Amino acid sequence: MILLENVKKIYKAKSGDVTAVDNANLKIEKGEIFGVIGYSGAGKSSLIRLFNQLEKPTSGQITIANRVISAITGSELRKARQEIGMIFQHFNLLWSRTVRENIEFPLEIAGVDKAKRRKRVDELIHLVGLEGRGDAYPSQLSGGQKQRVGIARALANNPQVLLCDEATSALDPETTDQILDLLLDINKRLGLTIVLITHEMHVIRKICNRVAVMEKGKIVETGPVLDVFRNPQQDITKRFVQQLTDSEDTNETIESLIEKYPDGKVVRLQFIGEAVERPVLQRLMQRSDIEVSILQGNIAQTNNGSYGSLVVHLNGEETAIQQAIEGIHQDQVELEVIAHG
């Protein structure tokens, strides 16, 4: 569906060239929700704006739906952009137009006749849950409602791809989840390919099938979300995963326990998929003559399944602890020894 091959974007500046995107290679399948995550300055906004040619690549090739979009211009590019919707962090609505008129705007530009425009706007207002707000102006809407207008407007021309540029960054957590649920519903109903960029791992976890991690203009890691949660390869990816799997006081809790109980081992168990539902600790205590203390636990739901992390203290004879660890491995649960006495 979407293919990026050796794509580079360089900005010219008085202080020297700035490479925002450095030889990016990506393949995004039709109908999937693909996330790009990175901290500020990683190059993710520059990357997503290359998809619809709001930014021109310095080199490389971008193909969307078998069309080399990086090689077209003029009317052909304008037509291609109608098949690529986009929503933004700060909504980019026309403040002098009502909700209906904002949604209708791209249809006017496309030359759709008035009757068809009205019908399409009615469909979109229903789709995004804005019934009764069609005659309201943006200033009368909440942040979540404004983004719903943005989504409806982006879908007006029945695009194949929806680009989301930090679409939830300006929203509170509850509204963020509502917008993410809406995007997930639209993806399932319409089979729409969604590409989103964010700095929040929660967004990736909640709706994405796969994720690419960017750092200093480079894509440093790519994979299914569940695999990235289970086995992050890069330090930056590990930091993002820890946003969800480790509470802020985990290290303090572990350090306090080590001081209080210098014997035994502190281990982190990682559960993936079906392993989350297994009674691992119950089995551990049944077959091992050791004491088990739970320090911290977390279970996250991703679009591909569950991921869990549990930090426990194992205390007893060394041989019994080793047998317990071997038993945990047999349950297909990953184990990391954090500290040992």
From Swiss-Prot:
Which Enzyme Commission number(s) are listed? Answer: 7.4.2.11
- Tell me the domain of life: Bacteria
Give the enzyme's main class according to its UniProt record, as a single word.
translocase
Q: Which InterPro entries match?
A: AAA+_ATPase (IPR003593), ABC_transporter-like_ATP-bd (IPR003439), ABC_transporter-like_CS (IPR017871), ACT-like_dom_sf (IPR045865), MetN_ABC (IPR041701), MetN_ABC_transporter-like (IPR050086), NIL_domain (IPR018449), P-loop_NTPase (IPR027417)
Boundaries of every ABC transporter domain copy: 2-241
Q: Which UniProt keywords apply?
A: Amino-acid transport, ATP-binding, Cell membrane, Membrane, Nucleotide-binding, Translocase, Transport
Gene3D superfamilies on file: 3.30.70.260, P-loop containing nucleotide triphosphate hydrolases
Indicate which residues the UniProt annotation says bind ATP.
G38, Y39, S40, G41, A42, G43, K44, S45
Q: Which GO terms describe its cellular component?
A: plasma membrane
Q: Does the keyword ATP-binding apply?
A: yes
Could you tell me what reaction this enzyme catalyses? L-methionine(out) + ATP + H2O = L-methionine(in) + ADP + phosphate + H(+); D-methionine(out) + ATP + H2O = D-methionine(in) + ADP + phosphate + H(+)
Single Gene Ontology MF annotation: ATP hydrolysis activity
Which locations, inside or outside the cell, does it occupy? Cell membrane
Task: Look up keyword Cytoplasm and say if it applies.
Answer: no
Task: Describe the protein's quaternary organization and the partners it interacts with.
Answer: The complex is composed of two ATP-binding proteins (MetN), two transmembrane proteins (MetI) and a solute-binding protein (MetQ).
Please state which protein family the record places this protein in: Belongs to the ABC transporter superfamily. Methionine importer (TC 3.A.1.24) family.
Q: What does this protein do?
A: Part of the ABC transporter complex MetNIQ involved in methionine import. Responsible for energy coupling to the transport system.
Q: What is this protein called?
A: Methionine import ATP-binding protein MetN 3
Q: Which organism is it from?
A: Bacillus cereus (strain ATCC 10987 / NRS 248)
Gene that specifies this protein: metN3
